[in-house]
Amino acid sequence: EIGGEFSELRGYLLAKLAWDPYCNVEAHMEDFCKGYYKEASPYILEYIKCLHDAQDKFGKRLDIFGGPQDAKKTFLTQKLVQHYDKLFAMAKEAVSYDKELLLRTETAYLPVLYAAIVLQYGSRNKRLERINQFARIARATGLKMVEEWKITVDQFVTDALAEL
């Protein structure tokens, strides 16, 4: 079971901060992404930057007690989600030669897919494509539950398909 959005990066940064609370977090984040995501790292780092910039602009954060609906008018607007989609498309293309790197990159993309599905962004075909992508990636990673353990992946997918 994966441990949430960017769980590997979070663990790495927490370890670095435990050793040196005054370390350069940005430098360590870049170092981790270059090593873990390889050629996808510039796009993933840009996604993280865009997400943080939008959150800062609106003074809004998404926490475990909220949902995508809470950020629909801030950092999860349809326009921003389309931008995140493009960044991850480039990231996936950059590592398409390696199944493991591609799965790591797709795993990082799961939260974007989840938000877009919940917010029902895009045409019916685009929404169906996202649902199918989410299901495939979730199964490949072994993800069983979503929404802080409220619902299984299979039930989430079934519900999303029913709302098409």
Range-by-range predicted roles:
Residues 13-164:
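Catalytic domains of carbohydrate-active enzymes that cleave complex glycans
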Residues 1-6, 49-53:
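A glycine-rich phosphate-binding loop feature that marks nucleotide/adenosyl-phosphate handling sites
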Residues 4-14:
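Histidine/acidic-residue-rich catalytic or RNA/ligand-binding cores of hydrolases
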